[in-house]
Design a protein with these regions (language model features):
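Hydrophobic ligand-binding cavity/cleft-lining segments
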Residues: 1-42
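Conserved short-loop catalytic and cofactor-binding motifs
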Residues: 8, 42-43, 58, 121
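Aromatic-glycine hotspot motif
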Residues: 2-18, 58, 93, 101-109, ...
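A conserved amphipathic terminal alpha-helix motif
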Residues: 113-149
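Hydrophobic-ligand binding "helix-grip"
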Residues: 31-32, 45-46, 56, 60-104, ...
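Hydrophobic pocket/interface hotspot
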Residues: 20-21, 55, 70, 79-81, ...
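Conserved strand-loop elements at the edges of beta-sheets that form or border functional pockets
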Residues: 13-15, 49, 72
Length: 149
């Protein structure tokens, strides 16, 4: 973590950049931890490609839970999004994921900003979010490394 408004998570994935980006944006429903979803057992998690696309959890009962909106799409190098997830849109933060080639691996940098708008509650949210991203990014790394090219 860096300051009160920002958190940064960096890690390496033993997979090419294009594969890592694809697993994050096209296969999230296969690896995203169920305990970090609205429904607890979604049918799918979709990152609609391109700026303005939605991030949507689709429940097995046909329900949709909008997690956010794509604000930047530079495949396979970067994706940015307004992150609502389980909160009210007025409490949204911004996330930017950058995928950089480092030899035969991919360095992933996740930067999330906007916690300060929540006032005193921002520090608590940031700490919980930091812990949640640890679980989510570990699951992602395992999936990206297991994915067939």
């Amino acid at each position: 973590m860096t300051d009160a408004d920002t958190l940064v998570v960096e890690f390496e994935v033993r997979a090419p950049v294009s594969q890592a980006f694809r697993v994050w944006t096209e296969r999230a429903g296969l690896w995203w931890p169920k305990g970090h979803t609205v429904s607890g057992d979604p049918e799918s998690i979709v990152f609609e490609p391109g700026v303005g696309g939605r991030i949507v959890e689709r429940g097995r009962d046909g329900s949709e839970h909008e997690w956010g909106e794509i604000t930047a799409w530079d495949a396979p190098r970067q994706i940015g999004f307004l992150w609502v997830h389980v909160f009210d849109r007025s409490q949204a933060t911004r996330v930017v994921l950058t995928f950089a080639e480092v030899g035969t691996t991919t360095r992933v940098r996740l930067e999330q900003t906007g916690f300060a708008v929540l006032g005193e509650a921002g520090a608590v949210r940031r700490e919980r979010t930091w812990n949640a991203w640890g679980v989510v990014t570990s699951a992602f790394a395992r999936a990206a490394e297991a994915e067939e090219g």
